[in-house]
Amino acid sequence: MSTFPAPVLGTPLSPTATRVMLLGAGELGKEVVIALQRLGVEVIAVDRYADAPGHQVAHRAHVVSMTDPQALRQVIEQERPHVVVPEIEAIATDLLVALEDEGAVRVTPTARAAHLTMNREGIHRLAAETLGLPTSPYRFVDTEQALREAIDGGIGYPCVIKPVMSSSGKGQSIIRSADDIAAAWRYAQEGGRVGAGRVIVEGFIEFDYEITLLTVRARGADGQIVTQFCEPIGHRQVDGDYVESWQPHPMSPAALQRSREIALAVTGDLGGLGIFGVELFVAGDQVWFSEVSPRPHDTGMVTLISQVQNEFELHARALLGLPVDTRLRQPGASSVIYGGVEARGVAFEGVAQALAEPGTDIRLFGKPESFAKRRMGVGLAVADDVDQARAKAARVSQAVRVRAGA
């Protein structure tokens, strides 16, 4: 096993500074910035739009098209970070691989992990074909006709279609019959992160529930890399986007063990240091791999209130080579606060009411612009059990009202 010298952290804005650059400064990136700031790290946040949540708390902020390799290289060379942390998928990952190969920068967890997980084809082929992990049956297709042939050739109905590059459920839909194919194809072409293109069609698995298993690769006190697991997180999605999550989700011992084995296999192959959000389907004691994100996961926002160290603190500590603590503090839940209006500079009402109940908290992300279904915040709650925590978190999010500013 590899060894590693004890980490030394510097002073921000000084010659000794430990510099970390985040590529992506949304609500998840913002929490990573805060976690790094608490450890005395100098943080540079990059996003495609001004005043992103992470921009508001970083030492320096840049507005850059992160899919433009020339622009991305320029900002990295300008800031000279010790570590680059991809916080979204829409990045010129070929450049990150090249820079890491050159020894110019360290990418967390690795540039290869960022590259493979930026589209569903890379990670599905790794999981199913290289590692032999159980997945839903799938095919990759480039035309509507090829989609029809894939479904008729064995995928069957119902099935799920997704762009190979998309996030938050964009472009994703269920095809229940041949009558749905044309509309589903158009929706997938509109929802892809880089426009029209390749899609994945997956056979439907009759699962009981799906979980996110936050998996952390970090160095122990002896410097060796060890893999640790948070308690499983259950979540509910609408149109492919998470609306609530809770921890822990009850599982059979056999299903939990199999989930950990799958997560260990895929994160071990991706390598590096940091947290991974491993998404799994579960039916009884059977477990199937779904997806993995080599970064904090949106469903993991429940850990802001449920764990000793939340997922953002775990990621920050791990990428710096520090030991981590994945223990659950108390059963908890999160519930999304949606914008509900289309406006800039919105105001939030009902915050005092939302926080009046003991064991609750909120995060307001500070996004400069609201849309009807844009996540603008999250309600958080802990309780004696998950069901009580879910009910409390829902009351928190429902109490907060978003209105257009004056």
UniProtKB/Swiss-Prot annotation:
Gene3D superfamilies: 3.40.50.20, ATP-grasp fold, A domain, ATP-grasp fold, B domain. Pathway: Purine metabolism; IMP biosynthesis via de novo pathway; N(2)-formyl-N(1)-(5-phospho-D-ribosyl)glycinamide from N(1)-(5-phospho-D-ribosyl)glycinamide (formate route): step 1/1. ATP binds at residues 120, 162, 167-172, 202-205, 210. One of its GO terms (cellular component) is cytosol. Keywords: ATP-binding, Ligase, Magnesium, Metal-binding, Nucleotide-binding, Purine biosynthesis. One of its GO terms (molecular function) is phosphoribosylglycinamide formyltransferase activity. GO terms for biological process: 'de novo' IMP biosynthetic process. Its EC number is 6.3.1.21. Mg(2+) binds at residues 279, 291. N(1)-(5-phospho-beta-D-ribosyl)glycinamide binds at residues 27-28, 87, 298, 367, 374-375. It catalyses: N(1)-(5-phospho-beta-D-ribosyl)glycinamide + formate + ATP = N(2)-formyl-N(1)-(5-phospho-beta-D-ribosyl)glycinamide + ADP + phosphate + H(+). Pfam families: ATP-grasp (PF02222), PurT_C (PF21244), RS_preATP-grasp-like (PF22660). The keyword Transferase does not apply. Involved in the de novo purine biosynthesis. Catalyzes the transfer of formate to 5-phospho-ribosyl-glycinamide (GAR), producing 5-phospho-ribosyl-N-formylglycinamide (FGAR). Formate is provided by PurU via hydrolysis of 10-formyl-tetrahydrofolate. NCBIfam families: PRK09288.1, purT. Homodimer. Belongs to the PurK/PurT family. This is Formate-dependent phosphoribosylglycinamide formyltransferase.
